[in-house]
Regions:
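Catalytic-domain carbohydrate-binding cleft regions of carbohydrate-active enzymes
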Residues: 1-477
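Solvent-exposed beta-hairpin/edge-strand motifs
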Residues: 450-461, 560-572
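Accessory, solvent-exposed terminal regions and/or long lumenal/extracellular loops of proteins
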Residues: 478-570
């Protein structure tokens, strides 16, 4: 739009639909592109690019889901994530030293607020040099990480592409001496980012990616579990990179939109090589297809109500565009959150695939306990709801690897025949079974909710509602969250953080349906060798049956269902 003419990511894909037809357009061109969708001329759609080939995919299908499935078969799908990545994550620019990080972890357990991940922003580094740790602020980095691991936390560290110009700094020396950095007029190109004068790796070159992947070992050897790629548009402090900066024979003009994608690929390869686990990478810059390597977030948002309102349509649109694993900074990154805004944001965020609280230096702290007891209690309540939903979300990610349909969805994707869903952007579906209608406005204790045809049940009270429009009460500690009739939901029973469960707990709702539940070790690639279980769960009201469709992993020791308040023990 006119206010935000360029964002962190380039995804040249859109869908056109009405009550009669639907199609998708993917413009496979990574140069600077322009889309004029009827603005200049009402009946004209215009697509242009500053260079490259005109590779245009016209994607048809009987439904919107068909289009998304076809599009993701072209660009790739998000790999099955590690289970812990679906948990609550805490970040700030920055937690400045070991004492602050360990106190943060202690407070999550003290206040009984579930949390799986702590993120370390740029100040953990030695003078912002990538692949280093500060000897002054983090003198015992590995011991700190070990302590966090023993308390059930994983650790994510940020890295940037900008590599400090410093004689004797091995990462810099290798990149320069092996000509693996950008040049201008035949000389190493230097701009400024956090470390000061910096060079830019040529991630479009395989040799550079391989080197970067091996550098990741410096962090994984310290126990780091995952990597957050930032500033990889690439960002610069002394003006944008000139378009003729040379990246291994390719101009910045051509590579700009792909730079973050190549960095994410290198980071993914490094984590896979040096941990043998499913890589958890988060990237700020991305292009169509980056979902194969990385989770994304929407970037540096603000603690503003209209930014909260923007999150649901943003994440639903990213899901339609192949980015199944996406999130926005819970509470807002810039500016000061208030108790009300933080409370409403955590309620909204329980369905974000990436569930991370993040804020900027110089802003009011927004950890769950910093305001007052009421806010802390609300925050805890909805983090608990998120953890109940994790097995269901994990199932959605498994299904996404097959059909490309993201966990978070606009209502129209599930109810395309219902024209009332066409312009709804303040409600979303989590999978096919849960409708999420958070309060997104300040000072509001009621909201209008639209429920598609059929019966729906309040997730918290089990109140039954018919499809249609409803004005519902939603005081500050209440979230309008509804489950479709007949649904079967696997429920997480975690204590402080995500762990493998011995018991499968199901919530079963009046009606009938069949549900497929996926189980594996939650971290390795063993599932690619068939080491997983698939359970088919079917029911007509309280007559519940479970059978194994595929067995390659240890079974649950116990399966328990809850139907209308009644506990039912189930045998395979």
């Amino acid at each position: 739009n006119e206010q935000y003419r360029a964002l962190y990511k380039s995804v040249p894909f859109y869908i056109v639909f009405n009550s009669r037809f639907q199609y998708g357009i993917f413009f496979d061109n990574h140069f600077h592109t322009y889309f004029d969708l009827g603005k200049s001329y009402k009946d004209e759609l215009k697509v242009e690019a500053d260079g490259g080939n005109f590779n245009l995919f016209f994607i048809g299908g009987d439904t919107l889901k068909d289009i998304v499935t076809s599009y993701t078969s072209i660009t790739g799908r998000t790999h099955l994530p590690q289970l812990f990545t679906l948990g609550h994550q805490q970040s700030r620019w920055s937690y400045m030293n070991e004492k602050e990080v360990l106190e943060l972890a202690h407070n999550f357990r003290k206040y009984n607020i579930k949390c799986d991940v702590i993120h370390l922003d740029i100040d953990y580094m030695e003078r912002y040099k990538v692949f280093t740790t500060s000897k002054e602020s983090f003198p015992n980095f590995k011991e700190m990480v070990d302590s966090l691991h023993s308390s059930g936390f994983k650790v994510v560290t940020i890295i940037d592409p900008g590599t400090k110009v410093e004689k004797g700094y091995d990462t810099y020396e290798y990149l320069v001496n092996n000509k693996l950095c950008a040049t201008l007029n035949g000389e190493t190109y230097i701009n400024e980012v956090w470390p000061g004068e910096s060079i830019y790796p040529t991630f479009n070159k395989k040799e550079t990616r391989d080197f970067w992947a091996d550098e990741i070992k410096k962090l994984t050897d310290l126990g780091v579990d995952a990597i957050w790629d930032d500033m990889n548009e690439p960002a610069s402090f002394k003006g944008p990179l000139p378009l003729d900066v040379d990246f291994a024979g390719t101009s910045h003009k051509e590579i700009h939109n792909l730079y973050g994608n190549f960095m994410a690929e290198a980071t993914y390869d490094g984590l896979k090589k040096h941990t043998a686990k499913r890589p958890f990478v988060i990237t700020r810059a991305a292009f169509s297809g980056t979902q194969k390597y990385s989770t994304i977030w929407t970037g540096d948002n603000q603690s503003l109500w209209h930014h909260l309102r923007a999150n649901l349509p943003q994440l639903a649109s990213l899901g339609l565009s192949g980015f199944a694993f996406a999130g926005s900074d819970l509470g807002g990154f810039g500016g000061d959150a208030t108790p009300e805004l933080l409370s409403r944001w955590v309620e909204a965020a329980i369905v974000y695939p990436l569930f991370r609280n993040h804020s900027a230096m110089g802003t009011i702290r927004q950890e769950p306990w910093v305001f007052d007891k009421k806010t802390t209690d609300i925050y805890r309540k909805f983090v608990d709801v998120r953890y109940e939903l994790i097995p269901y979300i994990y199932d959605l990610f498994y299904k996404q690897t097959i059909d490309g349909i993201a966990p978070i969805r606009p209502l129209v994707l599930e109810y395309q025949e219902d024209e009332n869903t066409y312009k709804l952007n303040d409600e979303v579906m989590l999978g096919s079974n849960i409708l999420h209608a958070p309060v997104l406005d300040q000072g509001v204790d009621k909201r209008l909710v639209y429920l598609p045809k059929g019966k729906w049940y309040n997730y918290f009270t089990n109140e039954e509602l018919e499809g249609g429009y409803h004005i519902v009460d939603a005081p500050i500690d209440t979230l309008p969250l509804y489950v479709k009739e007949g649904s079967i939901l696997p429920i997480g029973t975690y204590e402080t953080h995500v762990e493998l469960l011995d018991e499968l707990v199901l919530k079963v709702y009046k009606g009938s349906s069949t549900y497929i539940h996926y189980q594996d070790d939650g971290e390795s690639f063993d599932y690619e060798q068939g080491k997983y279980n698939l359970y088919e769960i079917s029911h007509v009201d309280d007559d519940i049956k479970v059978k194994l469709l595929h067995e390659g992993y240890k079974r649950y020791k116990k399966i328990t269902a809850y139907y209308e308040g009644k506990k039912i023990d189930i045998k395979l």
